[in-house]
């Protein structure tokens, strides 16, 4: 429903309000006093943010053809590691410096201050974002026609290769269900390490919140660079599945090696940096697969469905990591589990999605 609303009312009037409400709901976490209040706020936050990511992926298909999509999705998704790169030390500083300021605890200030950028971004989106090329005042008529012609050719290429465009096709397609499973595996790996990375550093390197924040910058910075480089190379060659599978397997191997008991903290940091870079890059390049054969109503519904099913891994993974860590009193089984999820996702990708991207030749 979220992506259908985006098509109906326009991206600027859908994505903008999502970001504003997202920030406000996130900030309301500072008022939480009981477990049930926390669950309620987290549920509302999930409802609000659920339409944002698939909406942006769909929005990018309004502007970029398949041959440029890997680097464009990578550019968008670098916001994830960049937010970790910038946000980790800032979060550490807020927790350390703002504790008891104004009668609030550090974690309460954290929710207030980190909600502000989301609200501001939402306002700017509603004012300045062009929903489609037809709405872009900064394009002249020749540029607009050239872009629209290329997008039409891209859609025609999907249909020629048996692409799906009707709403029901998104749920009847076996490829869509396989992509749900692939994305579930990548999200399992990503969320599991993202939620527990500070705790892992706390047990192996330092207990200082600010230092933990600074150390966390390293994997996020490496991931941002890797995502862009792999995305650009994937678009240049027109190859998708092996780019995705290779970085996923490298990340999985790094997860496995980092799980070796007694591994030195610095070496563990290097391996986790490789693991996070691999998994985030695989998750970024993944979105070139559904947009290669889904179009029209099927694209909106299919992208949202894949994202929704995959994000169940975001709920399950941190829970499983916590349970395994508590049961075995170390994170070795949890890290092995995260690596296994990536390997399964990579195997499915290579087995079922080895077709090269259409229309990869460069145009002036």
Predicted regions and their residues:
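Glycine-rich segments within core transmembrane alpha-helices of 12-TM secondary carriers
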Residues: 71-95, 117-118, 307-317
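Extracytoplasmic gate region of multi-pass secondary transporters
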Residues: 168-231, 283, 287, 317-318
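Helix-breaking motifs and short loop linkers at transmembrane-helix boundaries and internal kinks
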Residues: 10, 31-37, 48, 65, ...
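Helix-to-loop junctions at the C-terminal end of transmembrane segments
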Residues: 1-11, 225-239, 325
